[in-house]
Amino acid sequence: MANERTLSIIKPDAVAKNVIGEIESRFEKAGLKIVAAKMLQLSQAQAEGFYAEHKERPFFGDLVGFMTSGPVIVQVLEGENAIAANRDLMGATNPKEAAAGTIRADFAQSIDANAVHGSDSPESAEREIAYFFGNEEICAR
């Protein structure tokens, strides 16, 4: 088992519902530590840059519009197999398919407004963390 870091974003829909603490509590109860966190209002350029891999997909414009519609919480989670653990906690991308008790089943509205983002691989985690955080902003715990 590897100690890993992953990026988590609490998306505008979940921030608007005021469930930030409930979501973060789930991370901590699962053994993940929050080692960096900040609230941001993403600009269009920031959202487009972060989701650049989806630029040619038909949903790109809607995704960027949604991610800039309100503040988000970006955070780095650390722990044993953090990437897989976070993805298990989040549940399926489509909340209608998400298992009961997952973040998306409990807090998401739709496949677009699905409450949270999490890195899907070690390579994505490294790139996504570096997109939002400098090394000096990540605190060992």
UniProtKB/Swiss-Prot annotation:
Keywords: ATP-binding, Cytoplasm, Kinase, Magnesium, Metal-binding, Nucleotide metabolism, Nucleotide-binding, Phosphoprotein, Transferase. It is found in: Cytoplasm. The active site is at H117. Its cofactor is Mg(2+). ATP binds at K11, F59, R87, T93, R104, N114. It catalyses: a 2'-deoxyribonucleoside 5'-diphosphate + ATP = a 2'-deoxyribonucleoside 5'-triphosphate + ADP; a ribonucleoside 5'-diphosphate + ATP = a ribonucleoside 5'-triphosphate + ADP. Its EC number is 2.7.4.6. One of its GO terms (molecular function) is metal ion binding. Its main location: cytoplasm. GO terms for biological process: CTP biosynthetic process; GTP biosynthetic process; UTP biosynthetic process. GO terms for cellular component: cytoplasm. Major role in the synthesis of nucleoside triphosphates other than ATP. The ATP gamma phosphate is transferred to the NDP beta phosphate via a ping-pong mechanism, using a phosphorylated active-site intermediate. HAMAP family: NDP_kinase. Homotetramer. Belongs to the NDK family. This is Nucleoside diphosphate kinase.
